[in-house]
Amino acid sequence: MKGLDEIRIDGLEVFANHGVFPEETRLGQKFLVSMRLYLSTRRAGLGDELAASVHYGEVCEFVTAYLKEHTWKLIEAAAEQTARAVLLRWPLIEGLSFELKKPWAPVGLPLESVSVRIDRRWHRAYVALGSNLGDRRAYLEGAVEALRALPDCRVVEVSDFIETKPFGGVEQGDFLNGCLALDTLLYPLELLHELG
């Protein structure tokens, strides 16, 4: 990610049970994980304090345990879910590149490995809020709390609510409006679906 520092983890070996074939999920096989964790390391670099960074040993332990505890048919699903779990677990990580290699992929031909690499990050989104029915403030506050409850969203800031006159000539009550900023792992259409 442009403008951010990165912590690199290359070739973390994990024995896990992912695959389409029953033997793969029953017997298991070796997987190799490589990650680029995108964050600012400036405070950690100036202060020499681990608390200002991300402990890459803990990330490795977490990823190993996560891949061992879950089973997916596709390495695409294993990569997606593990990357999401890392981003949710460590708030300092703004994004990551996650590669999952399957060196023993059962394709029946000589190959070094099969892999999937994904890039995931937190996105900033702005959501407008408004109501002119019933307990307007309660509706808006309920919407904010519903967004706070979404695991893939972090509400960053909520504006004050202001009252505005309706527009368009239709006889109706005044609106109570506001806006909020949130960071989300969801893609735009996924966020719209959650808001719907």
Task: Set out the residue ranges of the language-model regions.
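Core catalytic alpha/beta fold that binds nucleotide/phospho-ligands
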Residues: K68, K73, E94, W104-P106, ...
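N-terminal, polar/charged subdomain of small-to-medium soluble alpha/beta proteins
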Residues: M1-A125, S131
